[in-house]
A protein has these predicted regions:
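A short helix->loop->beta-strand "cap" motif at the edges of active sites that frequently abuts
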Residues: 89-93
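Hydrophobic positions in alpha-helices of CheY-like receiver
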Residues: 81-85
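Alpha/beta-hydrolase-fold catalytic nucleophile elbow
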Residues: 58, 97-98
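N-terminal cationic-hydrophobic initiation segments that often serve targeting/anchoring roles
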Residues: 48, 86-87, 118-121
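Conserved SGNH/GDSL esterase-like catalytic core that processes O-acyl groups on lipids
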Residues: 1-80, 103-111, 115
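Catalytic His-Asp segment of secreted/periplasmic serine-dependent ester chemistry enzymes
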Residues: 103-183
Length: 183
């Protein structure tokens, strides 16, 4: 059965070929380059109106890079938007991707934020998906070069190999959630 799957977040979500990977479903992509947690909060009414049967989110990396927010501010913002989404869509399964690895400059902050949001998201009934662990270099807490679109700067954008690796890890969780949906 065709399901409505909504992706929401920043450029990392925006760049994913979700409809290609999920052709048997209706896919809406609310991923926008440069978006922050505040931007996503502004899109919540649109997300709700799209009537998702499954919501997949990744947001927060631009809060560090674009606005230089503190870890506390990023945690507060992520949890605020997660709480609002959960309140407005109490029965919709949500998969929340952790912040993904970037450069050395941000990696420790990403790890700290991920550790702090995970238990709260789980308490909200949101599935926490550890994208950081999937995309990080095995020897350092940065994005693995072979998954990086901009390897000279250890940037945050994924290349095709990065998206494929992420989706291969994410797709079983997507399928689990889709299988649990009751008509």
């Amino acid at each position: 059965m065709k399901r409505r799957i909504v992706f929401a977040g920043d450029s990392i979500i925006h760049g994913g070929p979700w409809q290609y990977w999920l052709p048997e479903h209706y896919v809406t992509n609310f991923g926008f380059p440069g978006h922050t947690t505040s931007d996503l909060e502004g899109l919540v009414p649109n997300i709700v109106e799209s009537l998702p049967e499954l919501l997949i989110v990744m947001i927060g990396t631009n809060d560090f890079g674009k606005y230089r927010l503190t870890e506390d501010e990023v945690v507060t913002n992520i949890l605020s938007v997660a709480d609002e989404i959960r309140r407005l869509m109490p029965d919709v399964p949500i998969i929340w991707n952790s912040l993904s690895p970037r450069s050395d400059e941000f990696s420790q902050s990403m790890i700290e934020v991920n550790a702090r949001i995970k238990p709260v998201l789980e308490d909200l009934g949101i599935i926490y998906f550890d994208t950081f662990a999937i995309l990080k270099d095995p020897n350092r807490n940065i994005i693995e070069i072979k998954y990086c679109e901009d390897p000279d700067t250890f940037g945050l954008h994924l290349n095709n190999a990065g998206y494929n690796h992420w989706f291969k890890a994410l797709s079983p969780q997507i399928q689990i959630e889709l299988d649990l949906i009751q008509d």
